[in-house]
Design a protein with these regions (language model features):
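Mixed-charge, Lys/Arg-rich low-complexity intrinsically disordered regions
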Residues: 1-20, 24-28
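Intrinsically disordered, low-complexity peptide-like regions
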Residues: 5-9, 57, 73
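Generic short N-terminal amphipathic or hydrophobic helices
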Residues: 20-21, 42, 80
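Basic/aromatic-rich interaction segments and small domains that mediate binding to polyanionic partners
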Residues: 24-68
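Intrinsically disordered, low-complexity, charged/polar segments
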Residues: 61-85
Length: 85
């Protein structure tokens, strides 16, 4: 579900501009300020000019770039995904 939504966001033919995701961080605590096991409301955008995903918390406090869908999916477990945040 998560990988599919990210790939759709990355697709140049997609009309989806961003995703709003409720997810639990499964990466290492301290990585860009995120805490393992903590749930976050995220806004994810794919920046074509940089070739990467940019993830920020809805409140704008935390930010992390990801080069691939695999890298993002490795660090997050999504419980809800909504297009067009």
């Amino acid at each position: 579900m998560l990988t599919r939504a990210l790939n759709d966001l990355k697709n140049p033919k997609s009309k989806t501009v961003s995703l709003q995701i409720i997810a639990t961080f499964t990466g290492t605590t301290g990585s860009m300020g995120f805490v393992t096991g903590q749930r976050y409301e995220l806004i994810v955008r794919y920046i074509r000019s940089r070739g990467r995903f940019e993830v920020k918390t809805r409140d704008g406090q935390l930010f992390c770039p990801y080069q691939s869908t695999e890298a993002f999916a490795k660090n997050w477990s999504a419980s809800a995904i909504q297009k067009g945040a």
